[in-house]
Every structure is written in structure tokens, then in C-alpha cells.
A protein has these predicted regions:
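Preference for protein termini
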Residues: 1-298
Length: 298
């Protein structure tokens, strides 16, 4: 299977080099596509190349197996951290951070959404970093994939292989809803279909991704708002933002930045602490975003 991926890559590269002018036109098409889909990073079309990264079914299985193993280890480390004073000492987090980490999210699996950065070469997989607190990029990759689906149609040589794509937006939504369903099982007054709030600071470089997610969530029937942590209030035992009741928070704001602006976000944090909304990811995932975890796990 690895050899087959090599053949796909080589065939595609040969096609690109056969007609550089045509390839340049396809790249311009891809950039226009990203612009039309509002797939922006720092107000520019999301940076990419005309060369997608193909992986085989066997490589996919390797990735899935490794990610499951690492995710399980990271979840166990979070649990260990909460119970072991020596591990807490080694990690060196502050009392304020530890207070956030101790908040019960209302569901059992802390790593709802993660991005584990890695290189894969044939059968070898090397992880560089664990983005567990507020990972970005899933929705960008979906829009880029949609663009590539159009580009690859113009290179018939690829018809020899079946190219599959991932629906990342649906995967994000499913992960959020799985956590919400577990949270709601203990709070039956919460609605079956939550209002979702995507929360980060105003003007962040990844703001366009929130619009992509909002559009997708609403097409699936979930009312969604994009708001800032300073906008939250507590009314009648519920969290509200911009006058809307919020049941499920997709927390994109980085925990470290919340701590730097605690005086602005006291209500936001208090509402999460009191379990007035289901929040993903929980603050405790910040524990395993620290590079010290790589050393301790190995």
C-alpha cells in the first residue's frame, strides 16, 4: 500500500510538471475557491500548495491506532496529575491554573478535540506536539479538501485510484454533541438540541474558521453564535451571551490567555465552574499541552 501511495504521488507530480501553465491556473483556481468559501487565515486565503498529502488505508490505520493510544495515555496523565502531588510539582502549574484544572466538565473523556502534530513516512510516525487545549485547523482542512476535489477532477490520471476525503466539520460536531449528551444526561433540563457558542477573543487570526463552523452547525439544525468570553452573563441559572442562552460552549480561547485577563472573564469562568453549560475542551486539557508531558510519557 505504501508503494501505491508513492505511485499516486509520482503520477500527480508528473502531471503537474507536464503543463506548468495549467498547474499554475489550477493553483489560482484553488486560491479563488478558498477566497469564495471565506477560508481565511489572517485575512488571506488559507496557505496551501497544489500538492495534497496522500496517505494509504494502511497508513490511516497506523495513524488511528497511534492517536488512540496517545489520546488514552494523555487522558490517563490528566487523571494522574489530579491525584499525584509529585507530578503536579514536576509540571509546575500555578494554584490559579490548578483551580481551573479541577473543574468537573460533566463528561468522562477530557480530550474532546485534539490536534496531534506529526510526520508520517512510510510506516514511521513521529509526533512533535500535542495541541489539546484549543486546537485549530479542522475546518480549514475540510474547505481545502473540497477545493482539491475540484482540482483533482482535472487530472484524469488519478482516476486509477479511489481518493477518499474526511468530513472534518461533521467530526467536530459529533465530538461536541457526544460530550454534550453525556453532560445533559445529568442535567435533563438542558435541551436535546443545544445552542452552541464558539468562543474566542475578538479579532483572532482564525476567526474565519468560526464562520465556517457556524454555517455548518446551523445547516445541521443547531443554532450557533460566535462570541467573546467577556460577553457572558448568568441569568436564571443559565449562561447567556449576546442575550442568547448557551448550552454548549466550543472553547477556542486559549486557557493561558484567559488567565492573563481574569478580571474580564470572571463570569465566563464561574459559569463553567458551576456547570451552567457544557464546555469543550475542559480546562484540564491544558495540562497535556505542555511539552514536559512528552518527556514524562517517554
Amino acid at each position: 500500500m505504501i508503494d501505491q501511495v508513492g505511485k499516486v504521488n509520482m503520477s500527480y507530480l508528473i502531471e503537474l510538471l507536464k503543463d506548468v501553465k495549467f498547474a499554475s491556473e489550477q493553483y489560482e483556481f484553488l486560491m479563488r475557491f478558498l477566497q469564495e468559501k471565506k477560508c481565511f487565515f489572517k485575512n488571506k486565503p488559507f496557505p496551501t500548495l497544489l500538492k495534497p498529502h496522500f496517505i494509504s488505508p494502511q497508513q490511516t490505520r497506523i495513524l488511528v491506532h497511534a492517536v488512540k493510544k496517545i489520546s488514552s495515555a494523555l487522558a490517563k496523565f490528566i487523571d494522574l496529575y489530579r491525584r499525584d502531588e509529585e507530578v503536579k510539582r514536576l509540571m509546575g502549574f500555578s494554584d490559579v491554573q490548578n483551580a481551573l484544572f479541577s473543574i468537573d466538565p460533566g463528561y468522562s473523556i477530557p480530550l474532546v478535540l485534539t490536534r496531534l502534530d506529526a510526520f508520517i513516512d512510510d510506516y514511521t510516525l513521529k509526533f512533535l506536539e500535542f495541541n489539546c487545549d484549543s486546537p485549530a485547523g479542522m475546518s480549514y482542512s475540510e474547505i481545502v479538501e473540497l477545493g482539491f476535489q475540484q482540482v483533482l477532477k482535472r487530472y484524469p490520471v488519478l482516476n486509477e485510484w479511489k481518493v477518499e476525503y474526511l468530513n472534518m466539520n461533521q467530526r467536530v460536531l459529533d465530538a461536541l454533541l457526544d460530550s454534550y449528551d453525556e453532560f445533559r444526561s445529568k442535567k435533563p433540563s438542558f435541551p436535546e438540541r443545544p445552542t452552541i457558542a464558539i468562543v474566542d477573543w475578538e479579532g483572532v487570526s482564525t476567526a474565519a474558521e468560526f464562520d465556517i463552523l457556524k454555517d455548518y452547525f446551523e445547516r445541521k439544525g443547531y443554532e450557533t453564535i460566535i462570541t467573546f468570553p467577556q460577553k457572558f452573563t448568568i441569568k436564571r441559572g443559565l449562561m447567556e451571551a449576546d442575550g442568547e442562552p448557551v448550552h454548549l460552549i466550543y472553547k477556542r480561547v486559549i486557557t493561558r490567555e484567559l488567565l492573563e485577563r481574569l478580571d474580564e472573564v470572571e463570569v465566563f469562568i464561574q459559569g463553567i465552574k458551576d456547570g451552567l453549560a457544557c464546555t469543550c475542551n475542559p480546562f484540564s486539557t491544558n495540562i497535556v499541552g505542555n511539552k514536559k508531558v512528552l518527556a514524562l510519557l517517554t
